[in-house]
Amino acid sequence: MADEKSTGKRGHTSRRNFIAGTGLAAVSAPFYARSADNPSGDTRNCVDESERAKRIATAPKAPFDSIRDYMAALDAHGLLLRVPEIDQDEYQMTALMFRATDEYGFFESPAFMYDKVKIDGEWINGPVVGNFQGHVNTDCIAFGLEPDPHDIKVSYRRAKAHMNKLLDSTEDGRWPEIAPVELGRDEAPCKEITLSGDECDLTKFAFVKTNPADAGRYVNTGSVFTSDPELGNNFGTYRCEITGPRTLRINSEKNHAGYKMLLAARERGEKVGHVSIAVGQDPIIWLLSGAPLARQRGDGAVDELAIAGGMRGKALEVVKSDTSEMLVPAHAEMIIEGEVPLDAPLQTEGPFGEMFGYLGPQKQAVFWMNVTHITHRRDPWLMNSFTGMQRGYTTSPVEVLYERIMRRSIPNLIEFHYPQDMMGVSFVSIDKTAPGQGLEVGRTVANRVSICKVVVVVDADMDVLDRTQMLFTMGSRWQPDPATEIIPKGRGNITDPSSIVQGETSKIVIDATMQWPEEGGPANYAKRNRALLEELAPDALAQAHASFGEALRLWGKS
Protein backbone atom coordinates (compact mmCIF):
# COMPACT_ATOMS: atom_id res chain seq x y z
CA MET A 1 0.00 0.00 0.00
CA ALA A 2 2.89 2.36 0.61
CA ASP A 3 3.37 3.09 -3.08
CA GLU A 4 0.06 4.91 -3.20
CA LYS A 5 -0.59 8.61 -2.74
CA SER A 6 0.33 8.75 0.94
CA THR A 7 4.00 8.35 0.10
CA GLY A 8 4.05 11.01 -2.60
CA LYS A 9 5.00 8.51 -5.30
CA ARG A 10 3.59 8.13 -8.81
CA GLY A 11 3.74 11.87 -9.60
CA HIS A 12 1.06 12.65 -7.04
CA THR A 13 -1.77 14.87 -8.21
CA SER A 14 -3.57 16.91 -5.58
CA ARG A 15 -7.31 16.45 -5.21
CA ARG A 16 -7.81 20.01 -6.44
CA ASN A 17 -5.90 19.30 -9.65
CA PHE A 18 -7.70 15.97 -10.12
CA ILE A 19 -11.10 17.62 -9.80
CA ALA A 20 -10.11 20.41 -12.19
CA GLY A 21 -8.68 17.95 -14.69
CA THR A 22 -11.90 15.95 -14.80
CA GLY A 23 -14.21 18.95 -15.03
CA LEU A 24 -15.68 18.46 -11.55
CA ALA A 25 -14.41 21.61 -9.85
CA ALA A 26 -17.85 23.19 -9.73
CA VAL A 27 -19.70 20.13 -8.53
CA SER A 28 -17.63 19.13 -5.53
CA ALA A 29 -18.64 22.10 -3.39
CA PRO A 30 -21.57 20.40 -1.60
CA PHE A 31 -19.27 17.74 -0.19
CA TYR A 32 -15.97 19.59 0.40
CA ALA A 33 -15.90 22.58 2.69
CA ARG A 34 -13.73 25.27 1.09
CA SER A 35 -11.91 28.10 2.78
CA ALA A 36 -9.13 30.53 1.97
CA ASP A 37 -6.69 28.22 3.73
CA ASN A 38 -8.12 25.14 2.05
CA PRO A 39 -9.16 26.06 -1.49
CA SER A 40 -9.13 22.47 -2.65
CA GLY A 41 -11.70 21.41 -0.08
CA ASP A 42 -9.50 18.45 0.88
CA THR A 43 -10.65 17.60 4.40
CA ARG A 44 -7.91 15.03 4.91
CA ASN A 45 -5.13 17.55 4.35
CA CYS A 46 -6.87 20.59 5.79
CA VAL A 47 -4.63 22.72 8.02
CA ASP A 48 -7.60 23.40 10.30
CA GLU A 49 -8.09 19.96 11.83
CA SER A 50 -10.86 21.29 14.07
CA GLU A 51 -13.24 21.64 11.12
CA ARG A 52 -12.54 18.07 10.07
CA ALA A 53 -13.11 16.84 13.62
CA LYS A 54 -16.41 18.75 13.80
CA ARG A 55 -17.66 17.16 10.58
CA ILE A 56 -16.78 13.69 11.83
CA ALA A 57 -18.32 14.29 15.26
CA THR A 58 -21.70 15.27 13.80
CA ALA A 59 -21.82 12.52 11.15
CA PRO A 60 -23.73 9.24 11.60
CA LYS A 61 -21.82 6.58 13.51
CA ALA A 62 -21.41 2.85 13.12
CA PRO A 63 -23.14 0.49 13.19
CA PHE A 64 -24.76 1.93 10.09
CA ASP A 65 -28.30 0.75 9.42
CA SER A 66 -28.34 2.12 5.89
CA ILE A 67 -26.11 2.99 2.96
CA ARG A 68 -27.27 6.59 3.44
CA ASP A 69 -25.79 6.88 6.91
CA TYR A 70 -22.61 5.15 5.80
CA MET A 71 -22.11 7.49 2.83
CA ALA A 72 -22.67 10.48 5.12
CA ALA A 73 -19.84 9.19 7.31
CA LEU A 74 -17.57 8.84 4.28
CA ASP A 75 -18.43 12.40 3.34
CA ALA A 76 -17.51 13.64 6.81
CA HIS A 77 -14.11 11.97 6.45
CA GLY A 78 -13.52 13.66 3.09
CA LEU A 79 -13.86 10.45 1.12
CA LEU A 80 -16.82 11.28 -1.12
CA LEU A 81 -17.04 13.14 -4.43
CA ARG A 82 -20.52 14.08 -5.61
CA VAL A 83 -21.37 14.51 -9.30
CA PRO A 84 -24.76 16.13 -10.14
CA GLU A 85 -25.10 14.37 -13.48
CA ILE A 86 -23.04 12.08 -15.68
CA ASP A 87 -23.53 10.50 -19.10
CA GLN A 88 -23.10 6.74 -18.88
CA ASP A 89 -24.09 6.35 -22.52
CA GLU A 90 -20.59 7.78 -23.03
CA TYR A 91 -19.27 5.60 -20.16
CA GLN A 92 -18.20 8.64 -18.16
CA MET A 93 -18.77 6.89 -14.81
CA THR A 94 -16.44 4.10 -15.89
CA ALA A 95 -13.83 6.48 -17.27
CA LEU A 96 -13.91 8.59 -14.10
CA MET A 97 -13.35 5.49 -11.97
CA PHE A 98 -10.32 4.60 -14.08
CA ARG A 99 -9.03 8.18 -13.77
CA ALA A 100 -9.44 8.12 -10.01
CA THR A 101 -7.53 4.85 -9.80
CA ASP A 102 -4.82 6.28 -12.06
CA GLU A 103 -4.34 9.17 -9.64
CA TYR A 104 -4.97 7.59 -6.25
CA GLY A 105 -4.72 3.84 -6.76
CA PHE A 106 -7.13 1.20 -5.51
CA PHE A 107 -6.57 2.13 -1.89
CA GLU A 108 -7.06 5.91 -1.74
CA SER A 109 -9.61 6.74 -4.42
CA PRO A 110 -12.77 8.53 -3.29
CA ALA A 111 -16.25 7.14 -3.24
CA PHE A 112 -18.53 8.66 -5.87
CA MET A 113 -22.16 9.70 -5.79
CA TYR A 114 -23.92 10.39 -9.08
CA ASP A 115 -27.23 12.20 -8.61
CA LYS A 116 -28.51 11.73 -12.17
CA VAL A 117 -27.27 9.33 -14.84
CA LYS A 118 -27.93 9.24 -18.57
CA ILE A 119 -28.79 5.67 -19.58
CA ASP A 120 -30.08 4.59 -22.99
CA GLY A 121 -30.75 8.19 -23.95
CA GLU A 122 -32.73 9.07 -20.82
CA TRP A 123 -31.70 10.94 -17.68
CA ILE A 124 -32.60 8.76 -14.70
CA ASN A 125 -32.54 10.00 -11.13
CA GLY A 126 -30.22 8.22 -8.73
CA PRO A 127 -28.26 8.61 -6.76
CA VAL A 128 -25.86 5.87 -7.77
CA VAL A 129 -22.85 5.36 -5.51
CA GLY A 130 -19.59 3.72 -6.51
CA ASN A 131 -16.28 2.73 -4.90
CA PHE A 132 -18.04 2.76 -1.55
CA GLN A 133 -15.52 0.43 0.12
CA GLY A 134 -12.52 1.17 -2.08
CA HIS A 135 -10.56 3.48 0.19
CA VAL A 136 -8.61 1.62 2.87
CA ASN A 137 -9.94 3.92 5.58
CA THR A 138 -13.40 2.44 5.04
CA ASP A 139 -12.15 -0.68 6.86
CA CYS A 140 -12.15 1.48 9.98
CA ILE A 141 -15.18 3.65 9.26
CA ALA A 142 -17.49 0.71 8.53
CA PHE A 143 -16.75 -0.74 11.97
CA GLY A 144 -16.84 2.48 13.98
CA LEU A 145 -13.09 3.00 14.23
CA GLU A 146 -11.39 6.30 13.51
CA PRO A 147 -8.86 5.92 10.68
CA ASP A 148 -5.48 7.57 10.71
CA PRO A 149 -5.89 10.57 8.37
CA HIS A 150 -2.28 10.41 7.22
CA ASP A 151 -1.27 6.74 7.08
CA ILE A 152 -3.49 4.13 5.48
CA LYS A 153 -1.30 1.29 6.75
CA VAL A 154 -2.00 2.38 10.32
CA SER A 155 -5.71 2.50 9.49
CA TYR A 156 -5.65 -0.95 7.93
CA ARG A 157 -3.86 -2.56 10.86
CA ARG A 158 -6.22 -0.81 13.26
CA ALA A 159 -9.08 -2.50 11.43
CA LYS A 160 -7.29 -5.86 11.48
CA ALA A 161 -6.78 -5.57 15.24
CA HIS A 162 -10.52 -5.01 15.61
CA MET A 163 -11.27 -8.12 13.52
CA ASN A 164 -8.98 -10.20 15.71
CA LYS A 165 -10.76 -8.84 18.77
CA LEU A 166 -14.12 -9.89 17.32
CA LEU A 167 -12.86 -13.42 16.61
CA ASP A 168 -11.24 -13.64 20.05
CA SER A 169 -14.57 -12.80 21.67
CA THR A 170 -16.00 -16.26 20.88
CA GLU A 171 -14.93 -19.61 22.29
CA ASP A 172 -14.52 -21.24 18.88
CA GLY A 173 -12.73 -18.31 17.25
CA ARG A 174 -15.55 -17.59 14.82
CA TRP A 175 -17.42 -14.39 14.21
CA PRO A 176 -19.80 -13.45 17.04
CA GLU A 177 -23.52 -13.65 16.36
CA ILE A 178 -26.47 -11.51 17.36
CA ALA A 179 -29.83 -12.74 16.11
CA PRO A 180 -31.68 -10.35 13.79
CA VAL A 181 -34.77 -8.46 14.90
CA GLU A 182 -37.81 -8.72 12.64
CA LEU A 183 -39.78 -5.55 11.96
CA GLY A 184 -43.35 -5.27 10.82
CA ARG A 185 -43.90 -4.39 7.19
CA ASP A 186 -45.04 -0.86 7.97
CA GLU A 187 -41.86 -0.24 9.98
CA ALA A 188 -39.41 -1.22 7.24
CA PRO A 189 -37.99 1.60 5.09
CA CYS A 190 -37.48 -0.80 2.18
CA LYS A 191 -41.30 -1.15 1.93
CA GLU A 192 -42.11 2.54 1.40
CA ILE A 193 -43.05 2.00 -2.26
CA THR A 194 -44.55 -1.21 -3.66
CA LEU A 195 -44.62 -2.30 -7.30
CA SER A 196 -46.20 -5.55 -8.38
CA GLY A 197 -46.67 -7.44 -11.62
CA ASP A 198 -46.54 -5.23 -14.70
CA GLU A 199 -45.70 -2.22 -12.52
CA CYS A 200 -42.20 -3.68 -12.12
CA ASP A 201 -39.69 -2.28 -14.60
CA LEU A 202 -36.00 -2.53 -13.72
CA THR A 203 -35.06 -0.35 -16.70
CA LYS A 204 -36.68 2.66 -15.03
CA PHE A 205 -34.04 2.61 -12.29
CA ALA A 206 -30.43 3.75 -12.64
CA PHE A 207 -28.86 0.33 -13.14
CA VAL A 208 -26.04 0.84 -15.64
CA LYS A 209 -23.99 -0.93 -18.25
CA THR A 210 -20.56 -0.51 -16.69
CA ASN A 211 -18.26 -1.48 -19.56
CA PRO A 212 -18.84 -1.01 -23.30
CA ALA A 213 -18.16 -4.72 -23.86
CA ASP A 214 -20.55 -5.92 -21.13
CA ALA A 215 -23.66 -7.78 -22.25
CA GLY A 216 -25.92 -5.02 -21.00
CA ARG A 217 -27.17 -3.27 -17.87
CA TYR A 218 -26.68 -5.11 -14.59
CA VAL A 219 -27.82 -5.24 -11.02
CA ASN A 220 -24.24 -5.98 -10.00
CA THR A 221 -24.34 -5.22 -6.27
CA GLY A 222 -27.44 -7.12 -5.22
CA SER A 223 -27.38 -9.51 -2.27
CA VAL A 224 -29.26 -12.51 -3.67
CA PHE A 225 -31.22 -14.27 -0.90
CA THR A 226 -32.04 -17.97 -1.28
CA SER A 227 -33.16 -20.70 1.09
CA ASP A 228 -32.68 -24.46 1.44
CA PRO A 229 -34.05 -26.95 4.02
CA GLU A 230 -30.55 -28.32 4.73
CA LEU A 231 -28.19 -25.41 4.02
CA GLY A 232 -30.48 -22.85 5.61
CA ASN A 233 -30.70 -19.28 4.38
CA ASN A 234 -28.01 -17.64 2.30
CA PHE A 235 -27.23 -14.38 0.60
CA GLY A 236 -24.43 -13.71 -1.85
CA THR A 237 -23.43 -11.06 -4.35
CA TYR A 238 -24.11 -12.53 -7.78
CA ARG A 239 -24.24 -10.16 -10.69
CA CYS A 240 -27.61 -10.14 -12.43
CA GLU A 241 -27.92 -9.21 -16.09
CA ILE A 242 -31.06 -7.23 -16.90
CA THR A 243 -32.57 -8.86 -19.98
CA GLY A 244 -35.95 -7.16 -19.84
CA PRO A 245 -38.09 -4.97 -17.59
CA ARG A 246 -38.93 -8.02 -15.45
CA THR A 247 -36.20 -10.59 -16.16
CA LEU A 248 -32.76 -11.16 -14.68
CA ARG A 249 -30.06 -13.75 -15.34
CA ILE A 250 -28.30 -14.72 -12.10
CA ASN A 251 -24.58 -15.44 -12.33
CA SER A 252 -24.07 -17.67 -9.30
CA GLU A 253 -21.09 -19.96 -9.83
CA LYS A 254 -21.36 -23.70 -9.21
CA ASN A 255 -19.42 -23.43 -5.94
CA HIS A 256 -21.71 -20.71 -4.59
CA ALA A 257 -24.38 -21.55 -2.04
CA GLY A 258 -27.07 -19.81 -4.08
CA TYR A 259 -26.43 -22.02 -7.10
CA LYS A 260 -26.32 -25.16 -4.93
CA MET A 261 -29.66 -24.26 -3.35
CA LEU A 262 -31.43 -23.67 -6.66
CA LEU A 263 -29.92 -26.85 -8.11
CA ALA A 264 -31.01 -28.86 -5.07
CA ALA A 265 -34.55 -27.51 -5.40
CA ARG A 266 -34.63 -28.54 -9.06
CA GLU A 267 -33.36 -32.02 -8.20
CA ARG A 268 -36.13 -32.32 -5.59
CA GLY A 269 -38.61 -31.75 -8.40
CA GLU A 270 -39.64 -28.25 -7.41
CA LYS A 271 -40.86 -26.09 -10.28
CA VAL A 272 -40.07 -22.65 -8.87
CA GLY A 273 -37.32 -21.21 -6.70
CA HIS A 274 -38.01 -18.05 -4.74
CA VAL A 275 -35.38 -15.31 -4.71
CA SER A 276 -35.18 -11.91 -3.05
CA ILE A 277 -32.46 -9.44 -4.01
CA ALA A 278 -31.48 -6.64 -1.62
CA VAL A 279 -29.98 -3.57 -3.29
CA GLY A 280 -28.44 -0.61 -1.46
CA GLN A 281 -27.28 -2.53 1.59
CA ASP A 282 -25.52 -1.36 4.74
CA PRO A 283 -21.72 -1.86 4.64
CA ILE A 284 -21.62 -5.04 6.74
CA ILE A 285 -24.31 -6.84 4.74
CA TRP A 286 -22.42 -5.84 1.59
CA LEU A 287 -19.18 -7.22 3.03
CA LEU A 288 -20.68 -10.54 4.09
CA SER A 289 -22.52 -10.85 0.81
CA GLY A 290 -19.38 -10.68 -1.31
CA ALA A 291 -16.52 -11.92 0.87
CA PRO A 292 -15.73 -15.50 1.96
CA LEU A 293 -16.34 -14.87 5.64
CA ALA A 294 -19.44 -16.62 6.95
CA ARG A 295 -19.12 -20.18 5.70
CA GLN A 296 -16.03 -22.21 6.54
CA ARG A 297 -15.26 -25.74 5.48
CA GLY A 298 -17.48 -28.24 7.21
CA ASP A 299 -20.17 -25.74 8.07
CA GLY A 300 -23.76 -26.73 7.58
CA ALA A 301 -26.48 -24.12 7.92
CA VAL A 302 -25.05 -20.71 8.82
CA ASP A 303 -27.09 -17.73 10.00
CA GLU A 304 -25.38 -14.97 8.05
CA LEU A 305 -27.84 -12.36 9.31
CA ALA A 306 -26.80 -13.21 12.87
CA ILE A 307 -23.14 -12.94 11.88
CA ALA A 308 -23.89 -9.50 10.44
CA GLY A 309 -25.34 -8.53 13.80
CA GLY A 310 -22.31 -9.87 15.63
CA MET A 311 -19.88 -8.00 13.40
CA ARG A 312 -21.95 -4.82 13.77
CA GLY A 313 -22.29 -5.21 17.51
CA LYS A 314 -26.03 -4.63 17.09
CA ALA A 315 -28.88 -6.78 15.84
CA LEU A 316 -29.71 -6.32 12.18
CA GLU A 317 -33.28 -5.22 11.55
CA VAL A 318 -34.96 -7.43 8.97
CA VAL A 319 -38.37 -7.79 7.39
CA LYS A 320 -40.13 -10.64 5.65
CA SER A 321 -40.23 -10.63 1.85
CA ASP A 322 -43.69 -9.96 0.44
CA THR A 323 -43.77 -13.06 -1.79
CA SER A 324 -41.83 -15.57 0.33
CA GLU A 325 -40.76 -16.27 3.89
CA MET A 326 -37.21 -14.99 3.38
CA LEU A 327 -35.99 -12.28 5.73
CA VAL A 328 -34.17 -9.35 4.12
CA PRO A 329 -32.48 -6.20 5.50
CA ALA A 330 -35.23 -3.77 6.45
CA HIS A 331 -33.08 -0.72 5.69
CA ALA A 332 -32.02 -1.77 2.21
CA GLU A 333 -32.90 0.67 -0.54
CA MET A 334 -34.72 -1.88 -2.70
CA ILE A 335 -35.91 -5.47 -2.58
CA ILE A 336 -36.41 -7.25 -5.91
CA GLU A 337 -38.50 -10.41 -5.54
CA GLY A 338 -39.19 -13.07 -8.09
CA GLU A 339 -39.32 -16.66 -9.21
CA VAL A 340 -36.68 -18.85 -10.84
CA PRO A 341 -38.35 -21.34 -13.25
CA LEU A 342 -36.47 -24.49 -12.29
CA ASP A 343 -37.96 -26.61 -15.07
CA ALA A 344 -36.99 -24.15 -17.81
CA PRO A 345 -33.72 -24.29 -19.78
CA LEU A 346 -30.82 -22.33 -18.32
CA GLN A 347 -29.73 -19.24 -20.22
CA THR A 348 -26.54 -17.47 -21.25
CA GLU A 349 -25.15 -14.54 -19.26
CA GLY A 350 -22.42 -12.03 -20.00
CA PRO A 351 -19.78 -11.26 -21.03
CA PHE A 352 -18.83 -8.95 -18.17
CA GLY A 353 -15.66 -7.13 -17.08
CA GLU A 354 -14.20 -9.32 -14.30
CA MET A 355 -12.17 -8.57 -11.18
CA PHE A 356 -8.81 -9.40 -12.80
CA GLY A 357 -9.42 -6.39 -15.02
CA TYR A 358 -10.24 -8.38 -18.17
CA LEU A 359 -13.45 -9.15 -20.02
CA GLY A 360 -14.79 -12.49 -18.88
CA PRO A 361 -16.37 -15.05 -21.19
CA GLN A 362 -20.08 -15.48 -21.72
CA LYS A 363 -21.56 -18.00 -19.30
CA GLN A 364 -23.52 -20.69 -21.12
CA ALA A 365 -25.93 -21.91 -18.45
CA VAL A 366 -27.19 -19.78 -15.57
CA PHE A 367 -30.46 -19.65 -13.67
CA TRP A 368 -32.77 -16.79 -14.52
CA MET A 369 -35.56 -15.01 -12.72
CA ASN A 370 -38.97 -13.51 -13.43
CA VAL A 371 -39.37 -10.36 -11.34
CA THR A 372 -42.82 -10.32 -9.77
CA HIS A 373 -42.52 -7.71 -7.03
CA ILE A 374 -40.35 -4.71 -6.11
CA THR A 375 -40.39 -2.64 -2.96
CA HIS A 376 -38.09 0.31 -2.36
CA ARG A 377 -37.45 3.43 -0.35
CA ARG A 378 -38.54 6.75 -1.78
CA ASP A 379 -35.87 7.95 -4.20
CA PRO A 380 -33.78 4.80 -3.72
CA TRP A 381 -29.99 4.95 -3.60
CA LEU A 382 -28.38 2.36 -5.85
CA MET A 383 -24.85 0.98 -5.77
CA ASN A 384 -22.67 0.01 -8.72
CA SER A 385 -19.51 -2.06 -8.57
CA PHE A 386 -16.76 -1.07 -10.98
CA THR A 387 -15.32 -4.55 -11.00
CA GLY A 388 -11.61 -4.74 -11.75
CA MET A 389 -11.18 -0.97 -11.28
CA GLN A 390 -11.66 -0.74 -7.53
CA ARG A 391 -11.30 -2.63 -4.28
CA GLY A 392 -14.63 -4.36 -4.01
CA TYR A 393 -15.04 -4.57 -0.23
CA THR A 394 -13.25 -4.05 3.06
CA THR A 395 -10.57 -6.74 2.95
CA SER A 396 -9.22 -6.65 6.51
CA PRO A 397 -11.76 -9.20 7.86
CA VAL A 398 -10.90 -11.65 5.08
CA GLU A 399 -7.15 -11.37 5.57
CA VAL A 400 -7.47 -11.76 9.34
CA LEU A 401 -9.61 -14.87 8.91
CA TYR A 402 -7.10 -16.36 6.46
CA GLU A 403 -4.25 -15.59 8.87
CA ARG A 404 -5.98 -17.37 11.74
CA ILE A 405 -6.81 -20.42 9.63
CA MET A 406 -3.28 -20.64 8.22
CA ARG A 407 -1.62 -20.27 11.63
CA ARG A 408 -2.98 -23.70 12.50
CA SER A 409 -0.33 -25.13 10.18
CA ILE A 410 2.02 -22.10 10.05
CA PRO A 411 2.45 -21.01 13.69
CA ASN A 412 5.23 -18.55 12.83
CA LEU A 413 3.15 -16.65 10.25
CA ILE A 414 3.18 -12.93 10.96
CA GLU A 415 0.99 -11.36 8.29
CA PHE A 416 -0.77 -12.23 5.03
CA HIS A 417 -1.78 -9.77 2.33
CA TYR A 418 -3.30 -10.18 -1.11
CA PRO A 419 -3.63 -6.70 -2.66
CA GLN A 420 -6.74 -6.16 -4.75
CA ASP A 421 -4.88 -4.20 -7.41
CA MET A 422 -2.59 -7.19 -8.06
CA MET A 423 -5.06 -10.04 -8.36
CA GLY A 424 -3.28 -13.37 -8.04
CA VAL A 425 -0.29 -12.01 -6.09
CA SER A 426 0.11 -12.42 -2.33
CA PHE A 427 2.73 -11.57 0.28
CA VAL A 428 3.41 -13.51 3.48
CA SER A 429 5.79 -12.57 6.29
CA ILE A 430 7.12 -15.18 8.71
CA ASP A 431 9.44 -15.44 11.69
CA LYS A 432 11.80 -17.86 10.00
CA THR A 433 13.18 -20.51 12.35
CA ALA A 434 14.53 -23.23 10.05
CA PRO A 435 15.98 -23.68 6.57
CA GLY A 436 13.46 -24.49 3.86
CA GLN A 437 10.67 -22.80 5.76
CA GLY A 438 10.03 -20.09 3.18
CA LEU A 439 9.14 -22.52 0.41
CA GLU A 440 7.17 -24.70 2.81
CA VAL A 441 5.05 -21.78 3.99
CA GLY A 442 4.51 -20.50 0.46
CA ARG A 443 3.40 -23.95 -0.68
CA THR A 444 0.84 -24.10 2.13
CA VAL A 445 -0.58 -20.68 1.26
CA ALA A 446 -0.74 -21.48 -2.46
CA ASN A 447 -2.62 -24.71 -1.81
CA ARG A 448 -5.06 -23.16 0.66
CA VAL A 449 -6.02 -19.88 -1.05
CA SER A 450 -7.16 -20.23 -4.65
CA ILE A 451 -6.56 -16.58 -5.55
CA CYS A 452 -2.87 -16.88 -4.63
CA LYS A 453 -1.09 -17.67 -7.89
CA VAL A 454 2.16 -15.89 -7.00
CA VAL A 455 3.15 -16.28 -3.34
CA VAL A 456 6.07 -14.21 -2.05
CA VAL A 457 7.40 -15.14 1.41
CA VAL A 458 9.49 -12.56 3.29
CA ASP A 459 11.20 -12.19 6.65
CA ALA A 460 9.69 -10.60 9.74
CA ASP A 461 11.53 -7.31 9.16
CA MET A 462 9.64 -6.68 5.92
CA ASP A 463 6.20 -5.04 5.75
CA VAL A 464 3.81 -6.92 3.47
CA LEU A 465 1.67 -3.77 3.08
CA ASP A 466 4.63 -1.86 1.64
CA ARG A 467 4.93 -2.55 -2.09
CA THR A 468 8.38 -0.96 -2.27
CA GLN A 469 9.69 -3.20 0.49
CA MET A 470 8.29 -6.26 -1.25
CA LEU A 471 10.11 -5.45 -4.50
CA PHE A 472 13.22 -4.47 -2.55
CA THR A 473 13.42 -7.78 -0.73
CA MET A 474 12.76 -9.76 -3.90
CA GLY A 475 15.63 -7.95 -5.58
CA SER A 476 18.06 -8.23 -2.69
CA ARG A 477 17.23 -11.52 -0.91
CA TRP A 478 15.69 -13.80 -3.48
CA GLN A 479 17.83 -16.18 -5.52
CA PRO A 480 15.57 -17.70 -8.20
CA ASP A 481 17.64 -20.87 -7.95
CA PRO A 482 17.08 -22.55 -5.55
CA ALA A 483 14.51 -20.36 -3.73
CA THR A 484 11.64 -20.93 -6.17
CA GLU A 485 9.06 -23.66 -6.54
CA ILE A 486 6.61 -24.12 -9.41
CA ILE A 487 3.32 -25.87 -8.66
CA PRO A 488 2.23 -27.21 -12.07
CA LYS A 489 -1.46 -27.62 -11.24
CA GLY A 490 -3.37 -25.93 -8.46
CA ARG A 491 -6.77 -24.57 -7.54
CA GLY A 492 -7.22 -21.18 -9.19
CA ASN A 493 -9.77 -18.42 -9.46
CA ILE A 494 -12.44 -18.95 -12.08
CA THR A 495 -12.05 -15.38 -13.42
CA ASP A 496 -8.30 -15.66 -14.12
CA PRO A 497 -7.98 -14.78 -17.83
CA SER A 498 -4.71 -16.72 -18.19
CA SER A 499 -6.18 -20.08 -17.15
CA ILE A 500 -6.73 -22.66 -19.89
CA VAL A 501 -9.01 -24.76 -17.68
CA GLN A 502 -11.38 -22.63 -15.62
CA GLY A 503 -10.56 -22.87 -11.93
CA GLU A 504 -7.11 -24.40 -12.49
CA THR A 505 -3.74 -22.67 -12.61
CA SER A 506 -0.05 -23.25 -12.16
CA LYS A 507 1.49 -21.36 -9.25
CA ILE A 508 4.87 -20.07 -8.15
CA VAL A 509 6.30 -19.77 -4.66
CA ILE A 510 9.08 -17.22 -4.22
CA ASP A 511 11.16 -17.53 -1.07
CA ALA A 512 12.41 -13.98 -0.59
CA THR A 513 13.58 -14.59 2.96
CA MET A 514 17.29 -14.26 3.71
CA GLN A 515 18.76 -17.56 2.60
CA TRP A 516 20.64 -19.40 5.33
CA PRO A 517 23.95 -21.14 4.59
CA GLU A 518 22.11 -24.48 4.65
CA GLU A 519 19.95 -23.13 1.79
CA GLY A 520 22.92 -21.93 -0.24
CA GLY A 521 22.94 -18.39 1.18
CA PRO A 522 25.96 -16.37 2.37
CA ALA A 523 27.59 -17.24 5.67
CA ASN A 524 27.11 -13.67 6.91
CA TYR A 525 24.21 -11.74 5.41
CA ALA A 526 24.91 -8.01 5.13
CA LYS A 527 22.72 -5.67 7.18
CA ARG A 528 20.40 -3.17 5.53
CA ASN A 529 21.45 0.47 5.64
CA ARG A 530 18.22 1.47 7.37
CA ALA A 531 18.66 -1.23 10.00
CA LEU A 532 22.16 0.08 10.69
CA LEU A 533 20.80 3.63 11.02
CA GLU A 534 18.23 2.42 13.55
CA GLU A 535 20.93 0.51 15.42
CA LEU A 536 23.75 3.06 15.40
CA ALA A 537 21.70 6.29 15.47
CA PRO A 538 18.52 5.15 17.24
CA ASP A 539 17.03 8.65 17.66
CA ALA A 540 17.61 9.92 14.12
CA LEU A 541 14.30 8.90 12.55
CA ALA A 542 12.22 10.21 15.46
CA GLN A 543 14.11 13.51 15.47
CA ALA A 544 13.68 13.94 11.72
CA HIS A 545 9.97 13.24 12.01
CA ALA A 546 9.52 15.68 14.89
CA SER A 547 11.38 18.46 13.09
CA PHE A 548 10.35 17.97 9.49
CA GLY A 549 7.56 15.39 9.36
CA GLU A 550 4.68 17.83 8.89
CA ALA A 551 6.46 19.76 6.16
CA LEU A 552 7.22 16.51 4.39
CA ARG A 553 3.60 15.35 4.67
CA LEU A 554 2.23 18.58 3.24
CA TRP A 555 4.71 18.71 0.38
CA GLY A 556 2.91 18.39 -2.91
CA LYS A 557 -0.56 18.42 -1.35
CA SER A 558 -1.58 21.90 -2.45
Please give the residue ranges for each predicted region:
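Intrinsically disordered, low-complexity segments enriched in polar/charged small residues
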Residues: 20-21, 39, 244
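N-terminal export leaders
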Residues: 14-22, 27
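N-terminal secretory signal peptides
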Residues: 1-14, 38-41
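Boundary at the C-terminal end of the N-terminal hydrophobic targeting segment
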Residues: 33-35
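Extended, highly charged
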Residues: 45-368, 372-558
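Helix-centric, low-specificity signal for extended rod-like, repetitive segments
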Residues: 8-9, 37, 48, 232
